[in-house]
């Protein structure tokens, strides 16, 4: 493990704050948002899962901007274990351009979650579809899943439709 990775891990574990990590990685004068984007570059080059987690923790505070939605491609890679963090962070963003991401995320199962009977990623992706219910495709996908034979996914879709009908 190199110094970058050690410092990233220590930050992810809460041992050092993000501000200190930024200084140690020579990003002291960079905004937290831009630093999160840099963390994703570091994550990809080093295949460092902790850096992905940290980046999306930062995006959770600063809201991933539409021009950066391409960064979500990292979600579909299997070398990290930050899939739940990514979809959770993004599920709170209202933007019709995210609907296809949520649809794909529902059916994506990373190898380390192959035995996940709770379908944690899919559930969070359904929250994202619910957040974007005003988008025609989101409503279409929720209705399609609500009428599907996939019991768990059907349940998640119905849950979102019922929740949203009470608003």
Model regions: which residues?
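N-terminal "cap/leader" segments of large eukaryotic alpha-helical scaffolds
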Residues: 1-43
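Short inter-helical turns and helix N-cap capping residues of alpha-solenoid HEAT/ARM repeat scaffolds
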Residues: 78-79, 110, 118, 149-151
């Amino acid at each position: 493990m190199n110094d970058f990775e050690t410092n990233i891990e220590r930050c992810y574990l809460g041992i050092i704050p993000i501000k200190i990590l930024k200084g140690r990685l020579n990003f002291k004068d960079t905004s937290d948002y831009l630093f999160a984007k840099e963390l994703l570059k570091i994550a990809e080059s080093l295949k460092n899962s902790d850096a992905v987690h940290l980046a999306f923790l930062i995006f959770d505070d600063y809201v991933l901007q539409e021009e950066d939605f391409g960064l979500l491609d990292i979600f579909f890679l299997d070398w990290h274990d930050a899939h739940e963090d990514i979809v959770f962070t993004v599920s709170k963003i209202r933007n019709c351009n995210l609907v296809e991401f949520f649809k794909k995320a529902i059916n994506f199962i990373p190898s380390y979650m192959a035995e996940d009977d709770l379908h944690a990623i899919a559930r969070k992706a359904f929250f994202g579809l619910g957040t974007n219910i005003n988008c025609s495709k989101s409503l279409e996908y929720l209705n399609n899943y609500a009428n599907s034979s996939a019991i768990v996914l059907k349940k998640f879709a119905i849950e979102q439709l019922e929740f949203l009908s009470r608003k």
